[in-house]
Amino acid sequence: MGSAVTKIVFQPPEPTYSKDPNLIWLNTSEHEVIPAFFIDRDAKFTLLFSHGNAEDLGMIIQYFREVSHILEVNIFAYEYTGYGMSTGEAHEQAIYADIEAAFKYLRDIIGIPWQEVVLYGRSIGSGPSVHLAAKTAVRAMVLQSPLASIYRVALNTRFTLPGDMFPNVDRIGKVLCPTYIVHGTKDEILPPEHAEALVRNCREGVAYPPYIVENGGHNNLEIVARQPFYDNFSKFLQWLEKEEIPEDLKLQAQETSL
């Protein structure tokens, strides 16, 4: 069932971009090669973005040039294995290897310390984001229209079943960094119960007040509530800049490393 679900879950579009000299090429631990782009505004925080399903880097780069300007952040976005100009075929472990390769490049090559990295996962991108935040220290995490787990979407179950993919609802309890969740009340793909379950399973003090977008769907939160969407995002980043880094997060940084 696992391989069948994998084929259903991952829906890479036909590549919308070609090889470009401005792309960064990363080698992953799964022996694949994936592209990424970096928008550098010399800002305090860098968003490490994990995109949604059925899209690739070519579909989001113009949008993130705007986001970088609005939020005054750097943005590092990477491609998934099997998507766009990447090699290989998409599967859960490959996606985890992709975000780990992206984080290592940010930290070791570009020189962005973990204290300035904010994970930003949208839809299926919540999976690799929660995986990384549970595994190593980052400054914060933003989840937009996240999923509790794949089987909770596909089978409408409230329990974690053997072979489940991206079990965010079980894993998020290991996350120590501040976590901000945004979801729409009319999300037709991932109902808001997914976000509610994630908030409920966060450790005490980890969940920043979530933003629930009235009448927001799965792919239109920035359209339905453009100004409040960015205002709330900015407020979170401003709060983050003033907030002391939690001691348990500092300890995690000392004890774990990719």
Segment roles from a protein language model:
Residues 174-176, 180-183, 187:
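Short beta-strand/loop motif that positions the catalytic acidic residue
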Residues 185-190, 218-220:
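Acidic catalytic loop of the alpha/beta-hydrolase fold
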